[in-house]
Amino acid sequence: MQLSITHPCCWTLRLLLVSNLLLWENVALVPTCLVRNGRCFASLEEMLERAVGLSEEISKQALQLFTEFDNQYAQSKQLINKNFKKCHTSSLELPKPSSTSVQTHPITLLKIASKLLSAWKVPLNDLVNNLPSLKDIHPNILSKAREIEAKSAGLLEGVKSILIQMQNGDTEDENYPGWSGLASLQSENEDDRLFAYYNMIRCEGRETQKVETALKMVKCKISNENNC
């Protein structure tokens, strides 16, 4: 006997089919992730992609910050003629482009990036808090410094999350160079104070590029690219 399409049995089958289609549709929309302790984490590749993108933004803004500060103060105060002081994180170097860098483990590179970001957490906070004391400081310089501080803090948390994932949850206390430049930023001598800011902003731009390079090297190694 042929059943009518309006027969209750047919309606039940149709409802089941629609329900199954909707179920699969919802499953397809749920992003894939790694589940640990009942929580959903982004994949390692996704986390690295975000970290690299954020590090590029920070490097770009750090260069803009230095350029604007240089244009406003360096020429008139002859800051460019002074000898730059060593950056407080200069000891945290990346492996040089050679066979050694190829053999460097991604975790080692991530730890260098983490130490650099940690070592600049206090200096960036001091920079943001003390920049307003400079005479005729441009609002763009202040806003860029604040953005760099906020994004660097976010990137540090991201790098730590990547390290936790790669080390299966294992964490360890990290030692990084301390910052002792606050007194120079608050010097009563205007020229000395300006040079302290100038040197610090230059160092910050240099070290953000290190972080960017380290993260790109990690991404390259994880992706098994040949030109790392």
UniProtKB/Swiss-Prot annotation:
Gene Ontology annotations for the cellular component aspect, listed alphabetically: extracellular space
Leader sequence segment: 1-29
Disulfide bonds listed in the record: C87-C203, C220-C228
GO terms for MF: hormone activity; prolactin receptor binding
InterPro entries: 4_helix_cytokine-like_core (IPR009079), Somatotropin/Prolactin (IPR001400)
GO BP terms: cell surface receptor signaling pathway; female pregnancy; mammary gland development; positive regulation of lactation; positive regulation of receptor signaling pathway via JAK-STAT; response to nutrient levels
Keywords: Disulfide bond, Hormone, Secreted, Signal
Tissue expression per record: Expressed specifically in the placenta. Highly expressed in invasive trophoblast cells lining the central placental vessel.
Main location: secreted
Cellular compartments annotated: Secreted
The family this protein is said to belong to: Belongs to the somatotropin/prolactin family.
This protein's name: Prolactin-2A1
